[in-house]
Amino acid sequence: MRILITGGAGLVGSHAAEYFARKKWNVVVLDNLMRSQIFGYDKGSVEYNWRYLGQYRNIKRIKGDVRNENDVKSALGKGVDVVIHSAGQPGVPSSVRVPLEDFSINAFGTLNVLECTRKKSPRATIVYCSTNKVYGENIDKISLKERKTRYVYKDRAGIDEDMLTDLTGHTPYGVSKLTGDLYTQEYAHIYKMKTGIFRMSCIYGARQFGFEDQGWVAWFIIATLKNKPITIYGDGKQVRDLLYAEDLIRGYEAFINSKLQHGIFNIGGGHENTTSLLEFIDEIEKLLGKRPKMTFSNWRPSDQKVYISDISKIKKILGWQPKISVKEGIKRLSDWVVKNESYFS
């Protein structure tokens, strides 16, 4: 089997590349290594995953941009069996600062990958890495109850795939990812391509170089270890379901191996793998023996108070469920950060 993974140097992409390389697939990763320019952090950390993947002989690394037709066609080569499109601009605050760049990467980049794949590998399975942000502020219309350390849904366990995506605000990031989501659906309908759309909740794992704009799970651990201050936007009671990257990739694999022609799945840790920011900080203290320096600020636009994925659909249809608990996953990430402390300034 031959697989192309866009955004192969990112958290999701690098975990996917390693996962399938270990299964003896021929893996091609495409990445422009431009995260440092978008987010303004150290380029050395951006290239860590790129170098890490170099240890696998069956991973071919190509520096290129998903917006460039020639780059994508070159990565596709004579054809592939699977495309995992994880490349993207992943930060909500960044999308507000540079909306044109955000749209160019997330919307046009996705369309370019779809069209190039249609021309060179029309029978390939395409996995699109979408996001819960496609639901926008509709999430905030759900009734909540406030408890000591977290908010909880008043009358539901989680968000399913029938949640509305329109008639609400999204942020530029939510709009650009929804555009890619809809285009991927359309390529399934009009061109009969096999496509799986995974609307991800909070994904984390080893080799995650988090910072304030993106990757908060890793950022909180890194900041605590390096004695850097963190800002809590809101009251810290906001809740997310966490999913370790390896578990996410198993979900992709389940779809790839299935007979489904098209599917849309909310994917995350589900109601059994949730944490609030305040609870997460308590967990950090248990692991590192200290708490981060914290300040509180106003809520950020479209920052959902609670987002928990209803994963019953993917459980039923693909037989998938998380294996790595939040406690175990956070320890894995924390151990990796401590071991690689020198990479964090």
Predicted features and spans:
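C-terminal "lid/loop" region of Rossmann-like NAD(P)-dependent oxidoreductases
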Residues: 235, 264-265, 278-281, 289-306, ...
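Hydrophobic "lid"/C-terminal helical patch
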Residues: 16, 252-256, 284, 330-337
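Conserved mid-core alpha-helix of short-chain dehydrogenase/reductase
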Residues: 71, 112-115, 242, 247-250, ...
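Glycine/proline-rich active-site loop of Rossmann-fold NAD(P)-dependent oxidoreductases
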Residues: 178, 191-194, 203-219, 226-228, ...
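N-terminal Rossmann-like NAD(P)+-binding domain of SDR-like oxidoreductases, especially those catalyzing
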Residues: 1-203, 331-332, 340
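Hydrophobic alpha-helix immediately C-terminal to the catalytic Tyr-X-X-X-Lys motif of short-chain
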Residues: 179, 183, 187, 220, ...
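Residue-level signal for the nucleotide or nucleotide-sugar donor/cofactor binding architecture
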Residues: 67, 97, 105-108, 171, ...
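Conserved C-terminal active-site "lid" loop/helix of NAD(P)H-dependent oxidoreductases
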Residues: 245, 264, 300-321, 328, ...
